[in-house]
Regions:
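Transmembrane-helix exit segments and adjacent C-terminal regions of multi-pass membrane proteins
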Residues: 2-31, 382, 393, 443-536
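Transmembrane helix-loop junctions in multipass membrane proteins, especially transporters and channels
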Residues: 111, 143, 174-175, 197-206, ...
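Cytoplasmic-side transmembrane-helix entry/capping segments in multi-pass membrane proteins
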Residues: 94, 146-158, 208-218, 243, ...
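Interfacial helix-cap and linker-helix signal at transmembrane-aqueous boundaries
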Residues: 50-51, 82-83, 168-176, 230, ...
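12-transmembrane solute porter fold
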Residues: 22-45, 58, 241-253, 262-437, ...
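Transmembrane-helix bundle of Major Facilitator Superfamily
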Residues: 2-198, 340, 351-354, 358-361, ...
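Structural signature of transmembrane alpha-helices in multi-pass secondary transporters
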Residues: 36, 65-68, 72, 99, ...
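Hydrophobic transmembrane-helix bundles of small-molecule transporters
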Residues: 152, 174-286, 292, 310-311, ...
Length: 536
């Protein structure tokens, strides 16, 4: 773990006033990104321990994940815009400080509401911090092969954070307590904060568009209230005022968000972008697929610990093959796209994930690891990895070159928003089915299994619906070959372009490996995914 002594040692190597080497700037930006991505997945294995210690309800447990995800999705684009206006270093520091402080508060929480509030503030801090990390990387390294390698490092660190989350969380919960999945961020965050304060260079964009704070607040509040209304259906039913009022309020807030976006001069989400078929269809497909795939880790962790009796560490180890499958899928997708076409790769990936969800829905209370966790988990996450990259490429193909970063940020936002609402729906479905099973005399492990199985069956159905949507609506075309990752520091930050978790990792090809790419070739999205041409 980094220590203050390490900072002092580096200080002697790079005195105040001297320009820090690019590798140090890249390392600090990647450290911030690692913390953000790690926190998406590290809490999953700690959920049963959190529930026991803080007395949280089963439906309420979803909010440990959703409080972070909704705040992150709602403010991510705003965080990128703030970096352009007020400086990327400044927003990096503000976001990291907020994230670190919230981690401390969450780790010390004595009640469920305190933990959920801390997780929401964590998500807000991550939304401010994360968009600046990629821009800091691209602005510190000269364009060309060196920048491509720096971006590859950044994506690899993000992938590593997502893949390592379950294992790191399992070790911390088993050896210390669930609180350390949050408290571990404090010393690491403090060292990165002090180092960044001293060595990160400041930069900002020439674009002086104002912040769309009302838009960010409205969409975040709308999603949160809508998710709360959905979760109320399990206990109150669909016709109770406790359900109908938040559902109506959430929909009204989202409608008001759309009105604000249509009328403001500098909208958070320019609605005109969705006139392009590629942009609208890819975002809809990502929203739908994300609503199912986002839930996989949540339910798999609960099944492993609550039903099969795994320890947190064993649960983390059990999901390592699934984490590696995501990496394999996301690395393989760009190689298949030039041959099969981006739409076909996305369809194949979603079908694979649907098969995995269907297989997982056959789980039993005496589940075998190979056939009821590992193999279906690999299929689900291999499909997730194969799906995300072509959808991102399709979306950016429908945007003007100057809007590629914005569209890439939107596709990440769509996935996270879909995931947060999907988790609310599926948690409610699982809890209702479990309650009915218990009422019918089923044992607790059996009842829990029935609830989790129904959630996976629902996810399989949603993914099959996503396949139909992709076949009917997505434009068809074959992806371009390898391309140079030419990333604009302005667009990457301005539009909140950020890898949210391992599912969004894209393949970045070194410049020296791209034949004839310099000065020509396909446009490239600011996340490194080749933006290809498609017939509309």
């Amino acid at each position: 773990m980094p220590r203050a002594a390490d900072v002092s040692r580096i200080s002697r190597l790079f005195p105040q006033g001297a320009a820090p080497p690019a590798w140090l700037v890249v390392a600090l930006a990647c450290a911030g990104q690692f913390l953000v991505v790690l926190d998406v997945s590290v809490v999953n294995v700690a959920l049963p321990s959190m529930r026991t210690d803080l007395g949280m309800s089963a439906p309420g447990l979803q909010w440990v994940v959703n409080a972070y995800a909704i705040a992150f999705a709602g403010f991510m684009l705003l965080g990128g815009r703030a970096g352009d206006l007020y400086g990327r270093k400044r927003m990096f520091l503000v976001g990291l400080a907020l994230f670190t402080l919230a981690s401390l508060c969450g780790g010390l929480a004595q009640d469920g509401w305190q933990l959920l509030l801390a997780r929401a503030v964590q998500g807000l801090g991550a939304a401010v911090l994360a968009p600046s990390t990629l821009t800091i990387v691209t602005s510190s390294v000269a364009e060309g092969a060196a920048r491509a390698r720096a971006i590859a490092t950044w994506t690899a660190v993000g992938a590593g954070g997502g893949a390592a989350g379950g294992l790191v969380g399992g070790v911390l919960v088993d050896t210390l307590s669930w609180r350390w999945v949050l408290l571990i961020n404090v010393p690491v965050g403090a060292v990165v904060l002090l180092s960044s304060l001293r060595w990160l260079p400041e930069s900002r964009a020439g674009d002086r568009r104002r912040l769309d704070l009302p838009g960010a607040v409205l969409v975040t509040a709308g999603l949160g209230v809508l998710a709360y209304g959905i979760s109320q259906t399990e206990a109150e039913g669909w016709t109770a005022a406790a359900t109908l009022v938040p559902l109506a309020a959430g929909l009204a807030l989202i409608a008001l968000f759309l009105v604000v976006e249509a009328r403001t001069a500098a909208p958070l989400m320019p609605l005109g972008l969705f006139r392009a078929r590629a942009v609208s269809s890819a975002n809809a497909a990502m929203f739908l697929s994300g609503s199912a795939m986002f839930c996989m880790w949540f339910f798999m962790t609960l099944y492993a610990q609550n039903v099969l009796g795994y320890t947190p560490l064993e649960a983390g180890l059990a999901l390592v093959p699934s984490s590696l499958a995501v990496l394999l899928g996301s690395k393989s997708a760009p190689r298949f796209m030039p041959v099969l076409g981006a739409r076909n790769v996305a369809v194949i990936g979603t079908l694979l994930a649907a098969v995995g969800f269907g297989w997982q829905s056959l789980m039993t209370a005496r589940g075998d690891y190979l056939t009821e966790i590992m193999f279906p988990g690999i299929l689900m996450m291999l499909g997730a990895g194969l799906t995300a990259t072509p959808l991102a490429a399709l979306a950016t193909s429908g945007a003007a070159p100057g809007e590629a970063g914005l569209v890439s940020g939107l596709i990440n936002t769509s996935r996270t928003m879909g995931g947060s609402l999907g988790l609310a729906v599926m948690s409610t479905i699982a809890a209702a089915r479990t309650a009915r099973a218990v009422g019918g005399g089923g044992g607790t492990p059996v009842a829990l299994t029935e609830g989790y199985a129904l959630a996976f069956r629902t996810g399989a159905g949603v993914l099959l619906g996503g396949v139909v949507l992709m076949v009917v609506w997505l434009p068809w075309g074959k992806g371009a070959g390898p391309a140079v990752a030419r990333v604009s520091g302005v667009s990457a930050s301005a539009d909140g372009d950020v890898v949210v978790d391992v599912v969004d990792v894209v393949d970045v090809v070194d410049a020296e490996d791209a034949e004839g790419a310099e000065g020509a070739g396909p446009a490239v999205a600011s996340d490194g995914a080749a933006a290809t041409r498609f017939e509309k």
